[in-house]
Amino acid sequence: MHIPIPMVQISEAEYRVLRAIQSRGATAIESELSVEGLSDREIASAISWLEVKGLLDVERREIKTYALSSEGKRYLREGLPELVLYRKLKERGEMTMDEIRDLMPDTYRIALAQLAKFGITPKEGKLIYRNSGIEAAIEERQRFLQSMDPKNTAMIDHFRHRSGVIDEKIRTERIVRLNDSAYEAIAEFGGEGLIGSLDPSIIASGEWKTKNFRKYDLNSPSSVIRSSLKHPMTYLIEEIREIFLNMGFTEMGGHYIESTLWDMDSLFIPQDHPARDMQDTFYVEADSFDIDHPEISKKIRKIHEKGFDGYSGWGYRWSDAEARKLVLRTHTTVSTARYLYENNEPPQAIFSVEKVFRHESVDWKHLAEFYQIEGAVYSKDVSVSTLKWILRDFYAKLGFNDIKLIPSYYPYTEPSLDVVVRVNGKEVELGGSGLFRPEVLKILGLKAPVMAWGMGLERLAMMYYGLTDVRDLYNTDFEFLSSFRFNISRNGRNNYGKA
């Protein structure tokens, strides 16, 4: 926006930037603009001030760039999983699933999934080599990792949909154009050699006696002073906490780093579950560590391998080494499990609003680090009916008076329900819920049923603040940061549940 300033005064740096743009035919791209004696930062500052003064027309364009992630760099060095497997398959003719797992224990699932897209799928426990131009197609992917050619949109699109291989970065590029006022300012400028600021050296040398100083218009609009406000996410977290506390819940804490024993095994998630793949979970290297409550591992082993009282378990050989791996927690339900294990006398009503981590490619709707809202009730009165009641009550307090509960699937709850809300006439999934499976209750030594529900805080924030890109929640956009209270007040949370 241009701010009308009478009798515009420009600095020498601004004048030189105008002349540099003029020498390029009155239009220039900021990143390509160079002015002798001025740094890139000084040029950027001058452009911003010239725009404010109405002397430049500025067009902003978003430029997307792509770079290899740490996983992508690994594939560049070692070869894509599908290429490694295909070449080994070509060498041997056929391979069993055990041979494939031994060859590439961390990436065999990725390799199998990618080869399946070329029609190579396991038959009777074996993968059989087939030659139909597949190797050339895979090698083209490998060559792209070397070149990262931005013009190869097909490869960019392919790898954007593969989690964790390439990172997308967005930068804003400014294209600046002189307008009529700019030419007038250039013609009228007579300030070369003007002193813009007085410092001790100028006073000590006496230079100030013979030099001219830059004029300042004391009536010019000044920058808006922005008072300190809570970040919108902090504000929303406090709102959620207040809702839970007013409902009589107790807040629980947790750890960013968890053992898979607690993060997954305690919740009856099998050790070969896809969620454990390195493409979905951040694993942490550690020389030594102590697992809290190690005694639970015996019970976990028994229930995973053989089940109990008519429940069959998973029927595989449970691995203590796998259980001792460390991860950045993938959900906050691990905190619920530990809290109830340590406080196993019902009733208990607990909650948390804390960060979790997923190995996701960051885009408009995904983050690798985000907040999860978790609520749970442990009581002899827990049932599907009480779960439905408390969900309707909780979501109504968030402002969603019209919700639907749809049968779903989660590894550690049965039955499971997705929560669907209505926003501006559209139905949007906003959370999951369910009753802990009997196997989970047995592992944790619980005496009564447990109902739990959760949702992503960022998705809720996007609805409240009218955003379409989750990354905007963490950008330093001062207009958004200073007006988010107004957005809540204007939209009214109580209206979100209405069509």
UniProtKB/Swiss-Prot annotation:
Protein's cellular compartments: Cytoplasm
Cofactor note (record): Binds 2 magnesium ions per tetramer.
Signal peptide: none
Main location group: cytoplasm
Biological processes annotated in GO: phenylalanyl-tRNA aminoacylation
CDD domains hit by this protein: PheRS_alpha_core
Binding site for L-phenylalanine: 333, 372-374, 412, 436
PROSITE patterns: AA_TRNA_LIGASE_II (PS50862)
Cofactor: Mg(2+)
Organism domain of life: Archaea
Alphabetized UniProt keyword annotations: Aminoacyl-tRNA synthetase, ATP-binding, Cytoplasm, Ligase, Magnesium, Metal-binding, Nucleotide-binding, Protein biosynthesis
GO cellular component term, pick one: cytoplasm
E.C. code: 6.1.1.20
Binding-site positions, Mg(2+): 414
Catalyses which reaction(s): tRNA(Phe) + L-phenylalanine + ATP = L-phenylalanyl-tRNA(Phe) + AMP + diphosphate + H(+)
Gene Ontology molecular functions: ATP binding; magnesium ion binding; phenylalanine-tRNA ligase activity; tRNA binding
Quaternary structure annotation from Swiss-Prot or TrEMBL: Tetramer of two alpha and two beta subunits.
Family label: Belongs to the class-II aminoacyl-tRNA synthetase family. Phe-tRNA synthetase alpha subunit type 2 subfamily.
The protein, known as: Phenylalanine--tRNA ligase alpha subunit
Protein's organism: Thermoplasma acidophilum (strain ATCC 25905 / DSM 1728 / JCM 9062 / NBRC 15155 / AMRC-C165)
